[in-house]
């Protein structure tokens, strides 16, 4: 008697569909609908967010996508956090793109290009993106350091929409990339001590601003590829600023007129 082999037995399992990104908060959700509306899967919101959600729901209705008003405990469950801001969009996930060769033109669209070398906290990544977008950065590079955070729900939430306005790339080997960029950028490391003030940098070409790991700063190999180092002068009462706060101050200084 022939054996009955279940259909599909022995076949490789189908790859699981990636979990959707959970984009939380009014500013982040608005930026998502502005920049990547086709990526939205569905929308959930509290009654108090009806004025914000109304136009977004009309867009979703036209494109036959789901939306629903929910209570706070359900929105917290959907968001995975109580810090949901009253509105959550589920969207197709986005990850940092591999850096192409040659580098894409968008890297040169702003006067300062943030380069993150081992920034491990996704909240810091998001806050850096928020400040960078505020000051007009168009792109950001993430290092190949295994500590480096990628785009995530937490990063999107803290970026307040900033990540949606930036192209994000991941370097295959950051020191090699910085050496390639050095002819077109002034590659500059932000360091806690020993650097020159930001206003002292020459302004003949855009600046690739290297921001190091929260605890240890840029790696020695990356520092060796930097043509300049800059440091913010403080009171001396604390060692340094949080990396996201320091980035915002540095970008403001570097984008202003040279002193």
Residue ranges and their predicted role:
Residues 48, 72-74, 144-147, 215:
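Short, ordered loop/turn segments at secondary-structure junctions
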């Amino acid at each position: 008697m022939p054996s009955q082999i279940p259909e599909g037995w022995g076949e490789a399992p189908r790859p699981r569909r990636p979990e959707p990104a959970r984009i939380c908060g009014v500013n982040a959700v608005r930026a998502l609908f502005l920049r990547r509306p086709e990526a939205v899967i569905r929308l959930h919101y509290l009654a108090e967010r009806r004025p914000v959600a109304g136009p977004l729901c009309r867009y979703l209705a036209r494109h036959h996508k789901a939306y629903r008003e929910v209570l706070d405990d359900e929105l917290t469950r959907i968001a995975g956090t109580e810090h949901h801001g009253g509105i959550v969009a589920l969207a197709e996930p986005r990850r940092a793109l591999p850096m192409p060769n040659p580098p894409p033109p968008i890297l040169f669209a702003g006067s300062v290009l943030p380069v993150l070398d081992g920034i491990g906290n996704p909240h810091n990544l998001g806050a850096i993106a928020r400040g960078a977008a505020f000051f007009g950065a168009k792109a950001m590079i993430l290092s190949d350091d295994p500590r480096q955070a990628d785009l995530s729900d937490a990063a999107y939430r803290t970026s307040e929409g900033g990540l949606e306005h930036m192209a994000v790339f991941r370097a295959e080997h950051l020191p090699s990339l910085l050496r390639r960029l050095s002819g077109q950028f002034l590659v500059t490391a932000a360091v806690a001590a020993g650097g020159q003030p930001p206003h002292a940098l020459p302004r003949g070409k855009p600046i690739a601003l290297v921001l190091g790991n929260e605890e240890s700063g840029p790696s020695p190999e990356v520092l060796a590829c930097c043509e300049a180092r800059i440091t913010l002068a403080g009171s001396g009462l604390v060692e340094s600023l949080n990396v996201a706060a320091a980035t915002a101050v540095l970008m403001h200084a570097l984008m202003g007129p040279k002193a």
